[in-house]
Amino acid sequence: KNANTEKEQMEAKSSAKVLCVVGISQAIMFGIMHYFILYSSWIQANAGGEHAVIDIAKVSCILCGIIFIVLGNFMTKAKRNAVVGVRTVWSMHNDNTWRKSNRFGAICIIITGLLTIITTVFTSGMTGTIFMLIYLLLATIVTVVYSKKIYDKEIKK
């Protein structure tokens, strides 16, 4: 679908930038994970060890936490679209509900990233993964509920 108005063109450019950041962030994350897997395997092969030296789950959780923080900072920059951001029926109602929902969602994702990093540093990788999923689920639920509340306020105006 082609962007007809100048506003739609600006929104499309903004969304494209956010998608680019998402793609680059994921590529970096998987590249670092790949490096740690190869490095751990090399250490293990040379030492004749039976257990991995590096807990890849721990590295993955910390990287995911960093990605959440980065993406949370870019979430507020995305204009209303069908690809990036908090996309509920309520948040898509108008630009105001979109902006408020995505700002709140971004804060939740940043907090999720911080909590994931902190938790993973002090626990094992698998425990960190479980906590990360719990934090992400809670952030999603709270953001969707907030999106509905913003929508309800907007309808009453």
Residue ranges: model-predicted function:
Residues 1-157:
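Feature 926 captures the class I aminoacyl-tRNA synthetase adenylation module centered on the KMSKS loop
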